[in-house]
């Protein structure tokens, strides 16, 4: 099965968790909104200065020019958080800090570096007069009421992710709590008789430390889920059935297994899923990760990943990541995809899509450039991390999904 078709099968089999919970707004970063949030007030509520400078009546400086400077008296100072009590009189300016309210009568701000402070050598706090050599335009360098948010404006819609900008707006509006979708629970079941816990004091030469489960747990967290790590299950069909049933007792929204999903003599994971439920697909026309399967057991989706660390990571990103984001109620579940120019040729088997990690960077003249990463080259310092989709021998360009920002 093609991986795009596999994605469709998985997403069509899932329903968002649909359970909301209310969290304090400072804890909502990265969560998915379950309600529409409206701005309770204009932000800002009054005109504020965007810069450190001088509040001015634009009409007083309308004729200012380099050859015809306008001299105005400094009537005082006003800092951020201080109420403007006096009206700005014609022929005067008021030294203001960034975020300070504009006094009545002022309708513009001149940045201090664009004014000549008198007497010369004085600083802003001790200025007595200023010379303006360029006109002030009404509203210049001023935050007007509602510039950042207007009362009644939609700040968040259901399915929106609370990013830093949204969090800043919510906090600035004094919104104390937010209804968000519950994070999906993901049970992670590593399989393999050769595995020992990653932190085991000792591992025999014929054994392997189980790193997959820990890596997948971190990916689950990045995708917005809550990982539940389960004990290692051996390569035994009956034991795997029992391990799957015990995993379902933890009420996961998704069960992810690693290992035993191919066709080797000791690969029993897919068979155990078939014994207990339904296998919707097994085997993908991809490399790595041909031994990947998906099914349902007691209504719980089960994603069976390969046992290799890199293969498991890649297939989770391609299939598990969008599934988890869909379960979590996100509106957009797929990573952005671009067409990239390859810095070296890449080969792929006929009829198979090769999934290849790559480092990507933007070049103003050539567009996206992709450098394939090989087995031990995991990092992309200063560049995007991405995944190439090679559908045939590619010498020039290939599709790529963008993952980690530089």
Features from the language model and the residues they span:
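Short, low-complexity N-terminal leaders and the immediately following helix N-cap/first helix
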Residues: 1-66, 95, 107, 331-355
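Helix-rich terminal scaffold detector
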Residues: 3-4, 178-305, 309-315, 326
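C-terminal terminal segments
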Residues: 48, 125, 208, 328, ...
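Short, glycine/charged-enriched hinge/interface segments at domain edges or termini
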Residues: 55-231, 245-246
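Hydrophobic, low-charge alpha-helical segments
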Residues: 319-329
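Short beta-strand/loop turn elements enriched in aromatics
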Residues: 16-25, 46-71, 108, 114-126, ...
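Glycine-rich, charged/polar anion/phosphate-binding loops
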Residues: 36-42, 139-142, 170-177, 243, ...
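Short, surface-exposed secondary-structure edge patches
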Residues: 46-48, 82-87, 93, 144-147, ...
